Regions:
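Structured, acidic catalytic/metal-binding patches in enzyme active sites
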Residues: 28-266
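Short, well-ordered alpha-helical scaffold segments within catalytic/effector domains
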Residues: 8, 83, 271-275
Length: 334
């Protein structure tokens, strides 16, 4: 079976827009914990204890510098608070560039729009009932999911499952970065359209989509998603690109030709356009802080390598933690 969490994490930026419209039912004894809005004291404590997480690069071309950052789409208050080096980079930037602008109501509406006939097959009744049961287990209403492409539905349910381990989509890095940008009145640039985000999930033959939905549904029912999410969160916190690049291992699943084709379509095939969009914003003279899901950063087709091929001097920023002491599988020397 194909790697579970890695299948969905690259497109979770769109899922964040879906989650913004989902009202969580009041938590009961059988519901996953819900994260209450932090108090001012909790925020101040998180700021004082903030450390840098993820992976950050400087990218330099045409005499000025921008930044490239690998994000995660679930988190908690401590994980989400930018550390000192991230704050300095953000403060020096002229614009924030993310996969899609999760704060833009037009973008959010496009992500949540009902699927059309080209966006995924109809879900068989028995599988539909299982998806509804998963939404009930997550203590969220089914209605926001009912008209979405089925693969976007299981991606959102996967993100909700992480709440059992104290990881919540509302603390996804994109929301935190966007909040920082809004507070500074910094422009937010979408690197790709909502349509591209949806196509990343809803493309592929209908029978393969249904097979994928069935596999992820079964994994959610059996509790197999949580260990993979925890492993990804640990690797992201440590900036451990070696582990992240080996997603087939930490996801606990074997690979297959079909799975590899899906990863190529959902992640790496998008990277050239993402790199071109970052390059365009940088060439406009802006110092851009560009952030995408961290799986976009690994391998020969990762964004650091692609930007280097576009003429950038690309250098990993050391956070001085454990993750920086490990060999980087994607060195992009300047």
């Amino acid at each position: 079976m194909f790697s579970r969490w890695s299948r969905w994490s690259p497109v979770m930026a769109g899922v964040l827009c879906v989650m913004a419209s989902v009202s969580v039912v009041a938590a009961g004894p059988t519901c996953p914990p819900t994260l209450a809005p932090p108090t001012q004291d909790e925020i101040h404590a998180a700021v004082r204890g903030a450390r840098d997480h993820g992976a950050l690069w400087t990218i330099e071309k045409d005499g000025h510098e921008s930044w490239l950052y690998g994000t995660i789409h679930v988190g908690n208050l401590a994980m989400s608070m930018p550390g000192p080096k991230l704050v300095r980079a953000l403060a020096a930037a002229d614009a924030l560039a993310i996969e899609v602008d999760v704060t833009n109501p037009v973008v959010a509406q496009a992500i949540r729009a009902p699927r059309d006939s080209s966006e995924g097959p109809a879900v068989p009744p028995a599988l539909l009932e299982r998806l509804k049961a998963l939404a009930e287990k997550a203590c969220v209403p089914w209605e926001p999911f009912s008209k979405l492409p089925p693969m976007l539905t299981v991606a959102a349910l996967t993100a909700l499952e992480a709440r059992w381990d104290g990881l919540d989509p509302s603390y996804g890095t994109e929301f935190v970065l966007a909040g920082f940008a809004q507070a500074r009145k910094m422009p937010i640039v979408s690197l790709e359209s909502a349509g591209v985000q949806r196509k990343a999930l809803s493309g592929g033959p209908p029978d393969r989509q249904l097979a994928a939905v069935e596999r992820v549904t079964a994994a959610l029912e059996q509790g197999h998603m949580r260990p993979a999410v925890r492993a990804l969160a640990r690797a992201w916190q440590d900036g451990d690109l070696v582990t992240i690049a080996d997603y087939e291992q930490w996801s606990g699943s074997a690979s297959s030709p079909e799975a590899k084709a899906d990863v190529e379509r959902m992640v790496f095939s998008r990277n050239p356009d993402l790199a071109a969009a970052i390059d365009l914003t940088h060439r406009e003279g802006k110092r851009v802080f560009a952030a995408t899901g961290i799986l976009h950063m690994v391998g020969d087709g990762g964004l650091p390598k692609l930007l280097q091929k576009l003429g950038y001097k690309v250098q990993r920023v050391s956070f001085g933690g454990e993750g920086d002491e490990r060999p980087d599988p994607d060195p992009a020397p300047g």
